Amino acid sequence: MQIWHMEPFPCGDRRLPHHVFPPKKITTTQLGQLAGVQYYKVDLDDTASMKKRLSAVKTEKNVTFTDMFTVSETMLEFDDKMEQFYEPQVQKEDVISLVVEGTCYYDVEPEDDSWIRVQVEKGDLIVIPKGLSHRFTTTPQNFVKIQRFFSRKVEGNQG
């Protein structure tokens, strides 16, 4: 996982890093303090360790339902979906995502017009707290497979 402050008004391709200049990286601890976002590294190759970590998160967050969500250029209406995912949104429950394959960005907005970009990759589990404005996009590779966790079954494919 890599985390940095984004430029205030990013222009051009949203899938690029959009660092402020000079780059201002932050740690997972700082991300937690600034935005309440939690981060866990999950070893997907160690089944016992993975199950233990996921079980703890599921219990702590009252998870009762999971699904797999894949974003790739081959999906129907890819460009429209990416526009939709990049629109800032605020959820009524925590957004819990484990990257199973690929890489993507979650942008979080702890203060008005102050975005922090979080690049997550295989094995990264991120918990964005309910009520925090956030958005989602891919990297230029246009591929990510995410396991999502919910406290109830949801309909449709939200980002």
Curated annotation (Swiss-Prot):
**Recorded GO MF terms:** acireductone dioxygenase [iron(II)-requiring] activity
Please give the chief subcellular localization of this protein.
Answer: cytoplasm
Question: InterPro entries, alphabetically?
Answer: ARD, ARD_euk, RmlC-like_jellyroll, RmlC_Cupin_sf
The cellular location(s) given in this protein's UniProt record come to:
Cytoplasm; Nucleus
According to its UniProt entry, the protein's GO biological process terms are: L-methionine salvage from methylthioadenosine; methionine metabolic process
Q: Name one GO cellular component term.
A: cytoplasm
User: What keywords are annotated for this sequence in UniProt?
Assistant: Cytoplasm, Nucleus
Answer whether the UniProt record assigns the keyword Cytoplasm to this protein.
yes
Source domain of life is Eukaryota
Function statement: Probable inactive acireductone dioxygenase.
| Stated family | Belongs to the acireductone dioxygenase (ARD) family.
Q: Which HAMAP family match?
A: Salvage_MtnD_euk (MF_03154)
Name of the protein in question: Probable inactive acireductone dioxygenase 1
